Amino acid sequence: MPAGGAMRIDLSELPIDGTDNLFLDIQVKTIEKYNLLESDFEVAHQQFVLQEKINFTDRIDSSEEITLLEDEELLTVRSAKQKFIFNKSNGNLSRWLDEKGNEKLLHELSEQFTRAPLDNDIGVSEVEHIDSNAWLERWKAVGFYELKTLLKNMIIQATENEVIISVQTDYEAKGKIAFSTIREYHIFRNGELLLKVDFKRNIEFPEPARIGLCLQLAEKAENVTYFGLGPDENYPDRRGASLFGQWNLRITDMTTPYIFPSENGLRMETRELNYGRLKVRAMGQSFAFNLSPYSQNQLAKKGHWHLLEEEAGTWLNIDGFHMGVGGDDSWSPSVAQEYLLTKGNYHYEVSFKLT
């Protein structure tokens, strides 16, 4: 097809019935070698979403009983021969035992609002010449990296088919409330944990880097499968080359080894994630995630990638929302307004289940 030309291609009849995801992928490739471009070299691509699969989850059809045990420190829910153990001092899921009694978590499921700083977050700051406008300096100045968790309320409801645990938490930064959340855990008879999160931020503070969750899984699998944007890392303002798809990748492909360790490897618009026995599903809007042998804490502290040390299990970060990375000019806090988390209220939902 010549430059500026047009072509019509009629597609065969497609099953538009809601039972499958349908995408139309178009690639523009060179027919033959042209200057520096080899033949069959992709010069452009575009993806069109024709249909998204409609998913329903049957949580009631289970013969398993669901029981509740409570003492002064812990709340234990037994469902589908598994145990979900909550820490009553902070409302976090602190332990998850499978049907054989194997521990699935090495670090509790907690909320997370910061990221290991990117070069762009640091900007032109130096030890002796701090740039107060840099995102990292703004987050540090208000205390986002030293948040104090204040449990306000924890309410438990039990029915025949589920246990609902509602946790209200304030996150204090240098004596002021920066964030408030209500986490609603729904544990069903089939062993599924649905987590609904309502988030509110103090708009006097800078916008956070992310609004999400963090947990350290005991499992260390070789591969990960997910349905979302890929195959490479992508962020709100760095996703133009990514495509929706069912991606099956090695866990080593999920990190990007930047010379200076930082937040990396995010995959956005994820509907479903499968890693080892764990299945994570988006309920409503999609989520973003990254999987790594390195915690955000270690990434933030080490100065070079080769200094990183693999940790036990696998760190999983799940974000309902994540700000852009900026870097339009490579040295200033240039994240566009549309990619900042400026709203006062956010909501997201994800479900966790062992397969």
Give, region by region, the residue ranges found by the protein language model.
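Beta-sandwich strand segments
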Residues: 34-43, 329-330
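Intrinsically disordered, low-complexity Pro/Gly/Ser/Thr-rich segments with frequent PxxP/GP/PP motifs
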Residues: 1-31
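Beta-strand/loop-rich accessory regions of lumenal/periplasmic or secreted enzymes
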Residues: 14-19, 48-355
